[in-house]
Design a protein with these regions (language model features):
Chain B
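Periplasmic-binding protein-like
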Residues: 204-214, 253-277
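Mature extracytoplasmic/periplasmic domains
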Residues: 276-336
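Extracytoplasmic ligand-binding site segments that recognize negatively charged/polar headgroups
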Residues: 92-219, 224-235
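Early extracytoplasmic/lumenal segment of secretory-pathway proteins
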Residues: 37-100
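A ligand-binding cleft/hinge motif common to bilobed small-molecule-binding domains
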Residues: 97-100, 232, 238-256
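Conserved C-terminal helix/tail region of periplasmic/extracytoplasmic solute-binding proteins
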Residues: 229, 332-362
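N-terminal secretory signal peptides and thylakoid transit peptides that target proteins
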Residues: 3-20
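A bilobed periplasmic-binding-protein/Venus flytrap-type ligand-binding module shared by bacterial periplasmic
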Residues: 147-154, 189-193, 269-282, 300
Length: 281, 362, 260
């Protein structure tokens, strides 16, 4: 007997309902709550843009988004610049049968616990930490250099994770390129550098952009890394958001800040949308 | 709670109920196993989170204690806000904030005849804070000072006698600030010759300027762990807001660490313990409270892993060695030379936090 | 010339490997520290911090909790993602672009914001914090990932085989379980494994949505906040060791077989 063909809905409805219920609705709730205000300990539920106005007019608040954008941009650039040559070496210089092994090795620390990873960097960078001890032991330094509790530490902590991630994505991208492109370029008289700039780089750009966007989204929303490594010498957006509920129950402000952060990410998404289409290739 | 936000209009409540039950029904397996016979939930500072403190109590009474650690009364209130009435049984809170918490109707009066009130250091009874209309809402359990912790091998102890050293240039880049606005603002106020109890909005500009100056010469601002780490590892030599709670626990590993109350004095902090009015397990909660203020419980609490500090019970069974580390004999002098945490109104509190955030961002 | 560039490549790769492994090695070495503080000088080796971890009931419970949450939420994510991918790939869905957009939307939203939204909503509705709530949150972050991975692997050649099965009388459910799922199992497995990794390591949602019963990252965070201790090094090293063994097992069994 031929089974009756079900429509698409029984298959897609569960995922849609789930996303609506636990993603879209909480988001709407948060948007509504962001329009309330907390004055003293009393919650004023009259809708208004008080929290948003306060964000844009209070320098210490507004500075958080600027810090976040600066740090995240720096992280993204540093990570791409460090990871690309690594991915290239893995794809081109390492013998094919060792590539998989080398790749796994390059992303192995990915599997340390993420909270512990930031903490480990703290041990490396601290005043009495490993790097300072080595450099002073070797006589290269007389005074320890401050590295922990700075923006440098935050960026480094982030870059550590994203270099691994980007090495993986860029490697995958490079391996998908047909060698014919390079041969064609060589036949047309291009040297290595020309081939790279005019052929390889443009072809891997979509992969880089996807990885960079992923880095951007994950880094700009992360609380742990700046909290452990940044030493509260400056606040990034996630820290400011958490402060709203760790110091007092100011959920309206926390909601407003979350919405602002989300809008910033959306703008970044639109900026690189043409590379990010999740349509089937 | 003063706010009216628990009273939701009927229609919205219906929608909320419908959504809620859908979310609930979605996975019925959540129902979970029946709870053990006696289990209480306590909202505490990190020092209670130590098996050496909790396990003897559980062994003796069979009552399991679930602990949720917070840092700062604001966070405790935030966590209470995120819970349902009856979720919590025991609250440990800064002594100075007991009136604020009690005014919200969160605490239940305690039976005086079941507490060792006669054994408690008299200044720590803090009846102005803990008693209202003849009802005692909480009892102190531990106290200490937010003052200056320092490494005596790296700085001149004589310099630590005046608060102004904290925002002067002499130790620039070697200072950490404990990231809790109330005690540090209190210290700054005392350094400026103000009384912590009388602070008003008019005092904030001067405090703000001094905080910014202090931030300018400091290396980092950190929570309990970060600031302890910083001074323990030599990252900094001075910790603003430190005290015995930082140095006593580290004394064994790093004897160079010391603390002092400068001539302007220190900020006295105290923790009090109370029982939630909405608790369903008040008997078990009272047993735990009695254990905490008993001589044995007090000794264990005073020397718990997160931080050491003075017990309030004069009969606490501490060893002489422990008493020496805690400076048991110096307490009368210290108490005379200290002031309570600032206890700002909600409005002033919000202003103080704004100033603090501004300081963090500089 | 060629020689020089190879040397440079090797040097660069070693440098990056050094960068990537430095914190892990430091972490592991100082988990054997003898004293309280995990920075030089090293005065071990001592196993006492591993003893401290193994005798810490809460840490072990947290490992159990994390495993449970990761397993169940990944299973739910993979199943929902697979069904949706099948629905979209094999049927014309009116407004499909928008609906697909809704399903993958959480991918571009920070975990913090997803967690905050759930916290505020659950608090308003009076739903208590729990591991279950964390599981719900982890499905939100992993479902779009599973969907995207599986959807991208659903090629036309698979559709032909499914059509053949249907012509031979198989029902939709039979096709899905007996034909589609086995053909796509590498994608299903990859989705599940990746979801496991993300859920196991996720901090902020678990931090916001739990109270006493919590997951490993939150427990480690609590440990870090109570002061510097080589115990954190020990637990970190244990987790890393377990993960490496798992990755190695998966690599040697699953992917080796697939390659042949």
């Amino acid at each position: 007997m031929r089974g009756r063909r079900l429509g698409p809905w029984p298959f897609i409805a569960p995922a849609l309902a789930y996303t609506a219920l636990f993603f879209a609705i909480p988001f709407v709730v948060m948007a509504v709550v962001s329009l309330w205000t907390l004055s003293g300990t009393a919650l004023d539920m009259t809708p208004g843009f008080g929290n948003y106005i306060r964000f844009f007019t209070t320098e210490s608040f507004f500075k958080a988004i600027r810090n976040s954008l600066e740090v995240t941009a720096l992280v993204t650039i540093v990570s791409v610049v460090l990871a690309y040559p690594m991915a290239w070496i893995l794809a081109e210089k390492v013998p094919v049968r060792w590539q998989r092994m080398a790749l796994i090795l390059a992303i192995l620390p990915f599997w340390t616990s993420y909270v512990v990873r930031s903490y480990a960097w703290l041990l490396v960078l601290a005043e009495k930490g490993v790097i300072n001890s080595w450099l002073m032991g070797l006589g290269l330094l007389n005074e320890p250099v401050q590295m922990a509790n700075t923006r440098f530490a935050t960026v480094l902590g982030f870059a550590h994770f994203f270099v691994m991630l980007l090495t993986l994505t860029i490697y995958a991208n490079l391996k998908q390129l047909s060698p014919n492109y390079r041969r064609a370029a060589a036949d047309l008289g291009a040297n290595g550098i020309q081939t790279f700039i005019h052929v390889i780089l443009p072809l891997t750009l979509p992969g880089i952009m996807v990885g960079a966007f992923l880095t951007f989204v994950l880094a700009i929303g992360d609380y742990i890394t700046p909290q452990i490594l940044g030493g509260s010498n400056e606040l990034l957006m996630p820290q400011l958001i958490m402060l709203q509920i760790l110091r007092k129950p100011d959920f309206p402000m926390a909601s407003a800040l979350s919405i602002i952060l989300m809008i910033v990410v959306s703008i970044a998404y639109l900026a690189c949308a043409r590379w990010l289409k999740l349509e089937r290739a | 709670m003063k706010s009216n936000h628990r009273e939701v209009p009927a229609r919205r409540r219906l929608i909320a109920w419908a959504l809620g039950s859908t979310m609930f029904g979605f996975f019925a397996w959540q129902a979970g196993p029946a709870q053990a016979a006696e289990e209480i939930n306590a909202l505490v500072w990190c020092d209670h989170d130590d098996p050496n403190l909790i396990e003897p109590f559980t062994r003796e009474t069979g009552i399991k204690v679930n602990l949720k650690v917070y840092e700062g009364t604001g966070q405790a209130l935030s966590l209470i806000e995120q819970s349902q009435p009856g979720d919590w049984d025991v609250l440990v809170v800064d002594g100075i904030d007991v009136p604020r918490v009690a005014a919200q109707g969160l605490l239940d009066p305690l039976p005086d005849d079941k507490l060792p009130l006669a054994d408690i250091f008299p200044p720590l009874l803090m009846e102005a804070q803990t008693v209202k209309d003849g009802k005692r809402y909480a009892i102190s359990e531990k106290f200490g000072y937010n003052s200056i912790s320092y490494n005596k091998e790296k700085v001149d102890p004589a310099d630590m006698q005046a608060m102004a050293i904290l925002w002067g240039d002499k130790y620039k880049g070697r200072i950490a600030i404990y990231d809790y606005y109330l005690p540090v603002i209190g210290m700054v106020a005392m350094g400026l010759g103000k009384k912590t109890a009388d602070l008003t909005e008019a005092d904030l500009p001067a405090i703000r300027d001094t905080l910014l100056k202090m931030k300018g010469v400091s290396k980092l601002v950190g929570d309990v762990a970060t600031s302890q780490n910083a001074i323990a590892t030599g990252e900094v030599d001075i910790l603003v807001g430190g005290g015995e709670w930082v140095t006593a626990g580290l004394a064994k590993d790093n004897p160079a660490l010391d603390f002092v109350l400068p001539k302007e004095g220190g900020v006295l902090w105290s923790q009090a313990i109370g029982i939630f009015a909405a608790s369903q397990k008040k008997d078990a909660a009272l047993k735990f409270l009695q254990y905490i203020v008993s001589p044995e419980g007090q000794a264990r609490l005073a020397t718990s892993s997160c931080y050491w500090a003075m017990p309030v019970n004069t009969k606490a069974t501490l060893t002489d060695e422990q008493k020496k580390i805690l400076r048991w004999d110096d307490q009368p002098g210290y108490l005379a030379n200290s002031q309570l945490y600032p206890a700002p109104s909600a409005e002033l509190d919000a202003k103080m936090q704004e100033v603090w955030t501004e300081m963090l961002q500089k | 010339m060629r020689r020089a560039s190879d040397m440079a490549a090797v040097a660069y790769a070693l440098l990056i490997f050094g960068f990537i492994f430095l914190p892990v090695i430091v972490l592991a070495v100082f988990s054997f520290q003898g004293s309280q503080i995990p920075v030089p000088p090293f005065n071990g080796p001592s196993l006492k911090w591993y003893g401290a971890v193994l005798s810490d009931g809460r840490m072990l419970t947290a490992i159990g909790n994390s495993t449970l949450v990761a397993l169940i939420s990944s299973l739910v994510s993979t199943v929902l993602g697979f069904l949706a991918a099948y629905g979209f790939a094999r049927h014309a869905v009116p407004g499909g672009g928008w609906l697909k957009g809704l399903i993958v939307a959480p991918l571009s939203v920070s975990y913090l914001i997803i967690g905050m939204g759930l916290l505020i909503t659950f608090t308003r509705l009076g739903i208590p914090k729990s591991l279950f709530a964390v599981g719900l949150g982890h499905v939100v972050i992993n479902l779009p990932l599973c969907f995207a991975i599986i959807y991208s692997q659903m090629g036309e050649h698979h559709a032909n085989i499914e059509r053949a099965a249907r012509d031979l009388g198989a029902s939709d459910v039979q096709v899905l379980t007996l034909i589609t799922a086995p053909m796509l199992w590498p994608a299903l497995f990859a989705s599940f494994f990746l979801s496991m990794t993300f859920s196991w390591d996720e901090f902020i949602i678990a931090f916001l949505l739990t109270r006493f019963e919590t997951t490993l990252p939150v427990e480690i965070w609590t440990l870090l906040r109570s002061g510097l201790s080589p115990k954190a090094n020990a637990i970190g090293t244990v987790v890393f060791a377990i993960s490496i063994v798992l990755v190695a097992v998966i690599e040697l069994t699953v992917f080796r077989k697939r390659a042949r």
